[in-house]
């Protein structure tokens, strides 16, 4: 049996992935008491998990350090190459939205400034609309950008909308759905015969729509 190394996004995605794999019949109790460790191996040696930040999941998979990766689609939009996207795991559901202060006019054709942590998503969105905009990359709390006059609007991930409301912003348009995805290293798929049976088991579970985390 060949070991499968999985790069896993730390935090909420990690927690929901453990629930998913438990539902699929895998013993994930070894992940219960993590402490400060970032690398975990199952007692039977079948799996090794690497707990990393979302953007780094694609890096570990692309370079073959991890066979599989579990990461939000928002990250994949910004890092679109070097892996195969296998499954929509149907949890971590949210959306990309265009938001701004109530006085914002999306139909005003003046050149707009758009603040975002996702420049590729924002650029593609406005290109599809045929609008020329200035993209301002923000790494922190993008919600305050329109309030402070740095940007006319923002493109950001929205789950409940509470953060937008708390900062006086409204959603003007939903851009696309986002969820957690399973990705793979192409060489690993070819060389590790245990990966596809594992993927098929997860796909069967997700296909029965039994995955519903809140």
From Swiss-Prot:
It holds the Pfam family HisG. InterPro entries: ATP_PRibTrfase_cat, ATP_PRibTrfase_CS, ATP_PRibTrfase_HisG, ATP_PRibTrfase_HisG_short. PROSITE patterns: ATP_P_PHORIBOSYLTR (PS01316). Its EC number is 2.4.2.17. One of its GO terms (cellular component) is cytoplasm. Keywords: Amino-acid biosynthesis, ATP-binding, Cytoplasm, Glycosyltransferase, Histidine biosynthesis, Nucleotide-binding, Transferase. Pathway: Amino-acid biosynthesis; L-histidine biosynthesis; L-histidine from 5-phospho-alpha-D-ribose 1-diphosphate: step 1/9. Its main location: cytoplasm. CDD domains: PBP2_HisGs. It is an enzyme of class 2 (transferase). One of its GO terms (biological process) is L-histidine biosynthetic process. Disulfide bonds: none annotated. GO terms for molecular function: ATP binding; ATP phosphoribosyltransferase activity. It is found in: Cytoplasm. SUPFAM superfamilies: Periplasmic binding protein-like II (SSF53850). It catalyses: 1-(5-phospho-beta-D-ribosyl)-ATP + diphosphate = 5-phospho-alpha-D-ribose 1-diphosphate + ATP. Heteromultimer composed of HisG and HisZ subunits. PANTHER family: ATP PHOSPHORIBOSYLTRANSFERASE (PTHR21403:SF8), ATP PHOSPHORIBOSYLTRANSFERASE ATP-PRTASE (PTHR21403). Lacks the C-terminal regulatory region which is replaced by HisZ. Belongs to the ATP phosphoribosyltransferase family. Short subfamily. Catalyzes the condensation of ATP and 5-phosphoribose 1-diphosphate to form N'-(5'-phosphoribosyl)-ATP (PR-ATP). Has a crucial role in the pathway because the rate of histidine biosynthesis seems to be controlled primarily by regulation of HisG enzymatic activity. This is ATP phosphoribosyltransferase. It comes from Streptococcus gordonii (strain Challis / ATCC 35105 / BCRC 15272 / CH1 / DL1 / V288).
